Amino acid sequence: MDTILITVDALRADHLSQYGYERETMPVLQDCFAEGTTQFENAFANGTHTGISLPSLLTSRYLGDNPAINGPTIASALPDGVTTIGLHSNTYFAARIGEPAGFDIFEDFDVGASRETEATRSSVHRLFRKTMDAIRPTVERFGLREKAETMQRTIFPARLIHESTAYETAERTTNRALELVDDVEGELFLWVHYMDPHRPFCMHLDEPEYTDERLSSGEIHDLMSEAGINPDQITAEERELLIDLYDSELRYTSREIRRLINGLRDRSRWKNSNVIFTADHGEEFGEHGYYYHRNRPYDELLHVPMFVKGPHTGESLSEQRALLDVAPTICDWHDVSQPGGFLGEPLFEGDSRRVIATGSFTDSLPVVAGRWGGWKYIKTGDVRELYDLTADPNECENMAAAEPDRAELFHEAIPERLMNEDHSGVPTDTSDEVSERLADLGYLE
């Protein structure tokens, strides 16, 4: 029996039609995760960014139990005879966490290494883009835009014209995953992490989807930087453009996930496999004053999609679940005991979870949130927030002063160690290439 774990970076649940969004941003979920699949309506991340949430997913522990990633993981818990493969290209995860334990094959696309071919391609590509951006007004004035774009596509494939160098594209991620699967005999555990919905957003000219206008790389970069540094200066029109770019990335990623699934089908590794699809965290678009994921544990960052194909699946499940529950579920599927230290439970067992999530502001103040019983509690330094999620699902009216006893109950239920942990952890001892990628991802603003 094979197990497939597909995760998407920065994918918020409410930007999927399956969770009520007006756009069908990920049709692969409807086509490949419909019959015999359970949709979890209330799945939540245990951290607000990758460096917290992915370790929690892989180890079923909180980042406050640092260094959790060096302990048992999903991969190390699985029995002998199961080939374990992991793929990701998240520079932040690689720089901060390194390689999780237990994977027979772990592919991070050599993140941060000196790669002459890739570096040369990227440098030439950036120079070409800058030149095209500089001469664009002249090109358009003389009606030469079509010829310029033809020349651009001749030099660089269309899919690369606005490609980020901060991570590998979904296309290359799928290609590499299928290459690695081809070398496996016997049972397989495959984890594939797609990065494309994470900033920096790109334009895929072969499938633009939701962007009506073609933007230069410089224009996109400037807008993303402004949203990160001066979010209060972003206009309503610019916000909608950022959302269009984000949704287009979801659609592009959907296409590549479909190709992964079709490839697994062709290799007879899909029909009878157990599958989990989820995200490491969501994304902000100014709901609480910030863009991207500034580590503030409101639901736009914590509420993630989750679809599961396997034993006992079907219909939907509304009780709260957490990413901590992924590893115990996979252990259960493979009939192995959970390692000591796993804090989650199998997804199809038990009552609604008490979700605890950690994060931090960019000034590194520890932030901890608790979400259960229809309420959300957030503690940032000495400041407390409390939200009635039934009456105030958008978390706008802080009830901590009006409900001090309830706030105190939340406070007492959250482990003290999580309230004192520095959860920012932006790596500083990195190569120039890694630092450049971290900057492109927005972590150094």
Sequence positions of predicted segments:
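Catalytic domains that recognize anionic headgroups
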Residues: 1-445
